[in-house]
Amino acid sequence: MNETNMIDEIKRLKKEKNAVILAHNYQIPEIQEIADIVGDSLKLSQEATKTDADIVVLSGVKFMAESVKILSPNKKVLLPAHDAGCPMADMIDVDQLKEFKAEYPNVPVVCYVNSSAEVKAESDICCTSSNAIKVVRSLQSDKVIFVPDQNLAAYIAEQVPEKEIIPWQGFCITHHRVKDLEVDKIRKQMPEAVFLVHPECTPDVVKKADFVGSTSQIIQYAKESNAEKFVIGTEMGVLHKLKKENPTKKFYLLSPGLICFNMKKTTLVNVYEALRDEQHEIIVDEYVREKALKTLNQMLEIK
C-alpha cells in the first residue's frame, strides 16, 4: 500500500470507528499532517477530555497515552508505537518517590506530566512545561518537591524565588545534551536571530535564551514576533509546525542532538495498524487511575 492509499485508509477507519488522532509537536511531519489535533502535553490532555470519540490514537509516548486514559477511562486509548517510552519518566519510580517524600514530610509533590501513572498517583498535583510556574505558585507551601526533571525544577526555582524547590535528579536526555557553547557559537553566526528554548534544557542554556517556554509557547511566540530568524532549542519535530505556520520566517535548530528517537518511532503504518486492529491499547489500573486523576484534575483546574 502506498502512502496516499494508507492515508485514505486511516481517514476511512477513523470515520468508521469514531476515532480521533492526537499527535505531539515532536512527531514526524507525516503524523502531524494526519492528526486531528497537534499540540504539547497540556493541550493533548485537555483535548482528550473534550472529544466525543470512542477511540483515541495517541501519537506520542507512553506517559501521554496514560494521561489520556486517566482522564478518559471510557475511551479506548491506543499507542501505535507501543514501545515509545520516555527515558526521563523512567528515571523515577513510585518506590523512589515514596522514599524521597519520606525525607521531606508534609512537603507537596509537583509531578511533571513526563512521568508514569504510578508516580502521578503518588504526587499531589501534576504540571506541564507550559503551566509549571502557575502550578507551583498555586501551592500554599513554601517548599515544593519537584519530580522528575531537575532542569525544569531549576527554571521554576528562578521564576518562583519565594519557594524552595527540592528537585529529583532526572532529565530529558535530548534537551540535557545541548551545551551552552552551542548557543555561543550560533549567537556569533546569527546575532540577529531570536533564541527560543525549552525549560528542559540546562540552566546554562536557558539563561542565554531570549524566550523560554513549552513547545506550544515557542510556536505562539514565533507567530507573534516581528523577528525573521529564530534559533529553536527544543526537539526538531516542532520545526514542521513553525515552518508551516510562518512561511516567510527562518528557523534553525540550536543543536543537531535535538532529536528524540522515541518520538520518532510512530509511523503511518503504526497508526494504520493500530486503528485497523485496535491494537496496543493502554490500560491503567483503576486504583492508580483514580489517584492519578486527582493530580491531573488539580492541574487542569488552574487557570
Curated annotation (Swiss-Prot):
This is Quinolinate synthase. Pfam families: NadA. It catalyses: iminosuccinate + dihydroxyacetone phosphate = quinolinate + phosphate + 2 H2O + H(+). NCBIfam families: nadA, PRK09375.1-2, PRK09375.1-4. It is an enzyme of class 2 (transferase). Its EC number is 2.5.1.72. It comes from Alkaliphilus metalliredigens (strain QYMF). It comes from the Bacteria. [4Fe-4S] cluster binds at C86, C172, C260. The gene is nadA. Keywords: 4Fe-4S, Cytoplasm, Iron, Iron-sulfur, Metal-binding, Pyridine nucleotide biosynthesis, Transferase.
